[in-house]
Design a protein with these regions (language model features):
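Flexible, low-complexity linker and terminal segments
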Residues: 93-218
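Thiamine diphosphate
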Residues: 1-112, 122
């Protein structure tokens, strides 16, 4: 079926809606969800949405369910490289609380940068449970300075995906939108040092569910 492609195209439309002169709302949050095979299927539609970009009052989030042990899938899956190829900054939660926190960061980053963002949910997290803090004050999201050479970097979604304009859009993704994403990550301490040791000689980096497995093994 074409559900995945239609869903991604609808999310693209949600980001363009706020740019219309008769828009009723400042922006719309668009969220796409699919397992790894759905991401494979919807790649072209998502790529077009990424190029068009996200609204500063909306935000576009791609949530992908990965099943690395093929627990309920025909083949094992890991979507990291596919998401990277689609120019989607990747948030990888390790538990249910992480999924809520990083999901909020992903939407906030999308609004601040004009990028679509992604959230990778592995089977262990999707099937997991836990007590979570849902207070709206749990996160203090910081929107960093987005000026370059004194000019504000505000992205306006654009569906003119034809030459030569599409080449300008690709340049904007790599030179402007990615820079915004780096500033967001730094300002919000997204990549944390969780066991600070002043005299450390060796560091270990891990993400998502594997982070908790590494901590447990140590």
């Amino acid at each position: 079926n074409v559900n995945e492609e239609l869903g991604a195209t609808a999310v693209m439309g949600s980001q363009l809606a706020g740019e219309q002169p008769d828009a009723k709302y400042d922006g719309v949050v668009g969220i796409w969800f699919g397992k790894a095979p759905g991401l494979d299927r919807a790649g072209d539609a998502i790529r077009h949405g990424v190029y068009a970009g996200a609204s500063q009052h909306g935000g576009a989030l791609v949530i992908v369910g990965d099943d690395p042990a093929a627990k309920s899938s025909t083949v094992p899956s890991s979507s990291d490289l596919a998401l990277m190829d689609l120019h989607l900054p990747l948030f990888y939660p390790g538990d249910v609380q992480d999924a809520l926190d990083l999901g909020r960061h992903a939407i906030a980053m999308s609004r601040a940068t004009g990028l679509w963002t992604s959230l990778k949910i592995v089977a262990a997290v999707a099937d997991g449970s836990g007590t979570v803090d849902v207070s709206p004050d749990r996160l203090s999201i910081v929107i960093p300075d987005m000026h370059v050479d004194g000019a504000p970097l505000i992205h306006h979604p654009d569906s003119r995906l034809l030459p030569p304009h599409n080449l300008d859009i690709e340049r904007d993704i790599h030179t402007v939108r990615f820079e915004r994403a780096r500033r967001y990550v730094a300002a919000n301490d997204v990549n944390r040092i969780t066991v600070p040791t002043p005299d450390a000689r060796i560091g270990m980096a891990s993400t998502g569910a594997k982070y908790h497995e590494v901590r447990e093994s140590l």
